[in-house]
């Protein structure tokens, strides 16, 4: 079996919540990550933005707290998502979230 598990921390820059036609609650955020890591014995600045999707009842208790400016650590799996205009991007589907602020 292949492994697909990502842990990423950062600051929420955008958030929105909605229910699917099937009645499933979803929250979608944009997570901004900044850090420094060593690569080839050199310190490198790392920056990325990733869309994170929280789905289902288990996240309803934290949905109100997932607002712009909040620091979180999220664990989950990544998947390819195609937008309406046909562009592909990786998104993180949350399995666990920890509020840092």
UniProtKB/Swiss-Prot annotation:
UniProt-listed GO biological process terms: DNA replication, synthesis of primer
All copies of domain SSB, residue ranges: 1-101
One GO CC term, this protein: primosome complex
GO function terms (MF aspect): single-stranded DNA binding
Keywords on record: DNA replication, DNA-binding, Primosome
The family this protein is said to belong to: Belongs to the PriB family.
Primary role: Involved in the restart of stalled replication forks, which reloads the replicative helicase on sites other than the origin of replication; the PriA-PriB pathway is the major replication restart pathway. During primosome assembly it facilitates complex formation between PriA and DnaT on DNA; stabilizes PriA on DNA. Stimulates the DNA unwinding activity of PriA helicase.
Quaternary structure annotation from Swiss-Prot or TrEMBL: Homodimer. Interacts with PriA and DnaT. Component of the replication restart primosome. Primosome assembly occurs via a 'hand-off' mechanism. PriA binds to replication forks, subsequently PriB then DnaT bind; DnaT then displaces ssDNA to generate the helicase loading substrate.
Protein's name in the database: Replication restart protein PriB
Species for this entry: Shewanella sediminis (strain HAW-EB3)
Organism lineage string: Bacteria, Pseudomonadati, Pseudomonadota, Gammaproteobacteria, Alteromonadales
């Amino acid at each position: 079996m292949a492994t697909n598990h990502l842990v990423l921390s950062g600051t929420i820059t955008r958030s929105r919540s909605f229910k699917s036609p099937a009645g499933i609650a979803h929250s979608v955020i944009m997570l901004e990550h900044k850090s420094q890591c060593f690569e080839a014995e050199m310190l490198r600045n790392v920056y990325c933005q990733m869309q994170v999707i929280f789905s289902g009842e288990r996240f309803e208790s934290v949905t109100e707290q997932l607002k712009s400016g909040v620091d979180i650590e999220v664990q989950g799996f990544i998947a390819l998502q195609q937008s309406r205009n046909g562009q592909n991007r990786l998104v993180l589907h949350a399995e666990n979230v920890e509020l840092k602020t």
